[in-house]
Amino acid sequence: NRALLTLEEAGAYTGIGVHKLRNMCDQEGCKFVIWVGAKRMIKRKQLDEFLDNTYSL
């Protein structure tokens, strides 16, 4: 398993839509996104931890 996922891969992995993931990444203090140039990459471990501790999106 890769540590970094594209938005599309993260969507397939979690079942969350790409647009919702993009909105979540745009929130101040988002800890599961890293920018590689202009491309957003999702940190799988931090995304899992975020989802484990989140009641509602």
Residues of each region from the PLM?
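A detector for short, charged/polar N-terminal pre-domain segments
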Residues: 1-3
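Residues within the helices of the helix-turn-helix
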Residues: 7-8
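Major-groove DNA-recognition helix of helix-turn-helix-type DNA-binding domains
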Residues: 12-41, 48-49, 55
